[in-house]
Amino acid sequence: MSLYCGIACRRKFFWCYRLLSTYVTKTRYLFELKEDDDACKKAQQTGAFYLFHSLAPLLQTSAHQYLAPRHSLLELERLLGKFGQDAQRIEDSVLIGCSEQQEAWFALDLGLDSSFSISASLHKPEMETELKGSFIELRKALFQLNARDASLLSTAQALLRWHDAHQFCSRSGQPTKKNVAGSKRVCPSNNIIYYPQMAPVAITLVSDGTRCLLARQSSFPKGMYSALAGFCDIGESVEETIRREVAEEVGLEVESLQYYASQHWPFPSGSLMIACHATVKPGQTEIQVNLRELETAAWFSHDEVATALKRKGPYTQQQNGTFPFWLPPKLAISHQLIKEWVEKQTCSSLPA
């Protein structure tokens, strides 16, 4: 028995080492592509490209979900030539990742203004016909993508949007130039370097010990509730942001909080969602909704939330004029935050 356990442990260590080694190799390869323009250009030769049009990714429908097709450099050059575009437009692409086999992945938007083409935007309908797909708004398609494509396209859209918004130096007013990977932009007149940034957002599930507080904004789909969320102000820690947001939005004071996880979110322009659990002071649970921030907020029981987690929205209006209570889809960190609370409540209610 001890011999078997020893072999099993060694095998586990071996596979963990291989996983770590693959991750380190992949990470350092991406670092090299970001730092070395020549290496990145070489990677484009054997890489694959995800296409966008005005920040909407090219998608194809398959078995009740969307797939994000990839195109080789040769296919992309042929496509650009067919639509009268210079292949130099490929220099607008940005690096978004790579496979374990070091196939580099890039994203290129064919609908945004380009410094390499007079007629910058390619016509969307003709492109969709040629590519046998559709350019679909990412917000609408995100939850019908697999996890890998959702992550890659979210990264791509945020990077493409950032580059489109930072084509000029804020100090000199002169055009900035991106490196091949798109990991930075430089102003040639003063050498100021601009790096893509994300805005930190604290998303918090508030609990009073037995219930959790969920809210909705007027922009949410009908019937959907989620955890409280707000941008970090300059000078604030995450903890201070959470306490302020809870006080501002629902008039409650946080007693304790615990970090859960984080997630990149491409909307509205690239955010880092920092998810936490928070507990309010006992006996101080009366909600005072700030209508400038929220449409409504309410306490929900464990059973109500557990049932809502099983629903898939959005829903149509019921005969009585209401919409069923549902929660954000699984890919959203708010869903995972709420799910963990339900699981913890379930475990704590079980007999010892």
From Swiss-Prot:
Keyword Flavoprotein on entry: no
Subcellular location: Mitochondrion
Residue span of the annotated presequence: 1-20
Official protein name in the record: NAD(P)H pyrophosphatase NUDT13, mitochondrial
EC number from the UniProt entry: 3.6.1.22
Cofactor note text: Divalent metal cations. Mg(2+) or Mn(2+).
Classification via InterPro entries: NADH_PPase-like_N (IPR015375), NudC-like_C (IPR049734), NUDIX_hydrolase-like_dom_sf (IPR015797), NUDIX_hydrolase_CS (IPR020084), NUDIX_hydrolase_dom (IPR000086), Znr_NADH_PPase (IPR015376)
Protein function: NAD(P)H pyrophosphatase that hydrolyzes NADH into NMNH and AMP, and NADPH into NMNH and 2',5'-ADP. Has a marked preference for the reduced pyridine nucleotides. Does not show activity toward NAD-capped RNAs; the NAD-cap is an atypical cap present at the 5'-end of some RNAs.
GO molecular function per UniProt: metal ion binding; NAD+ diphosphatase activity; NADH pyrophosphatase activity; NADPH pyrophosphatase activity; pyrophosphatase activity
Listed cofactors: Mg(2+); Mn(2+)
Source taxon at top rank: Eukaryota
Gene: NUDT13
BP GO annotations: NADH metabolic process; NADP catabolic process; nucleobase-containing small molecule interconversion
Pfam families referenced in this protein's UniProt entry, alphabetically: NUDIX, NUDIX-like, Zn_ribbon_NUD
GO CC terms, sorted: mitochondrial matrix; mitochondrion
Primary enzyme class: hydrolase
Family assignment from sequence similarity: Belongs to the Nudix hydrolase family.
Residue positions of motif Nudix box: 216-240
Expressing tissues: Highly expressed in metastasis-suppressed chromosome 6 melanoma hybrids.
Reaction(s) this enzyme catalyzes, per UniProt: NADH + H2O = reduced beta-nicotinamide D-ribonucleotide + AMP + 2 H(+); NAD(+) + H2O = beta-nicotinamide D-ribonucleotide + AMP + 2 H(+); NADPH + H2O = reduced beta-nicotinamide D-ribonucleotide + adenosine 2',5'-bisphosphate + 2 H(+)
Domain (Nudix hydrolase) ranges: 196-323
Keyword vocabulary terms for this entry: Hydrolase, Magnesium, Manganese, Metal-binding, Mitochondrion, NAD, NADP, Transit peptide
SUPFAM superfamilies given in the database record: Nudix
